[in-house]
Amino acid sequence: MWPSDAHLALSLVVNVEEGAEMSLRDGDKGPEPVDELGVHLKIPIRNFANESNYLYGIRAGWPRVEAVLAKHGVPATFTAAALALERAPDIAKALSGGLHEPCSHGWRWVHQFSFDEARERDFVRKAVDSIRATTGQRPLGWLSRYLHSPRLRRTLAEEGFLYHMDDFSDDVPRWDVVETDAGPRAIVLVPYALDTNDMKFWLAPGYTPEQWLDYAIETFDVLHEEGAAAPRMMSLGVHLRIIGRPGRIRAFDRFIQHARSKRGVWFATRLQIARAFAAATPAPAEPAAT
């Protein structure tokens, strides 16, 4: 299924959310609740401390992450909230070169699952238009902030998305068929992973860099071994404000070093993975439209 009969497709996912998180400055009812210290303010005031923590991801975290990717010459999928790229043009420019892929993480990094259908569709379209304008690439994949509505996948198919990554159900992609106004359409589910995500540094009991690296390498080694019998994929998700800290960035570097030392590994964007899967696996027979 993978090029050159690779055992494992390795997907590095860089989340770009900083500058698009919840904030009173952008009209939200309260400040961003996701905080390294787990501080959840109950009153509607600006949390300048956490805002600066997110800004760290842009100012200091991004250069470190960019340097590690450039050192190894490997591609990554950047799941980006569109507004974050508008406010960080250097990152948007880095996604215009063709090596990396921009994937839509929404117009802003907010919960859209409660939106009505019209607002949700506008949210999707606004994200697409913005990312295309800042990077020169039209995003063909989507990742929500945690939850999504039952109709989102249908909306994505109707809006021309190739794949959806709000799924954690397997170690390989699969097809889904959704009913649209134009009839049934197939969309690729490219599963993501939370267990290898660097959010583990922020969630109690927080991982040390060594614990996170050990877990990521163990995951890689098992999937790489299994891939000799049947192709596998692995996702490693990181955030600029988290892995970009000086005490953590070497764990990211060392993981990539380990993966590059093994044969039969295909470093790929999620779009490349979705396309390879779709080329090798015919879409399921679509039921007749009713």
Predicted regions and their residues:
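Catalytic alpha-helical scaffold of carbohydrate-active enzymes acting on polysaccharides/glycoconjugates
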Residues: 1-188, 213-236, 242-290
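A conserved mid-domain beta-alpha-beta active-site/ligand-binding segment of alpha/beta enzyme cores
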Residues: 189-222
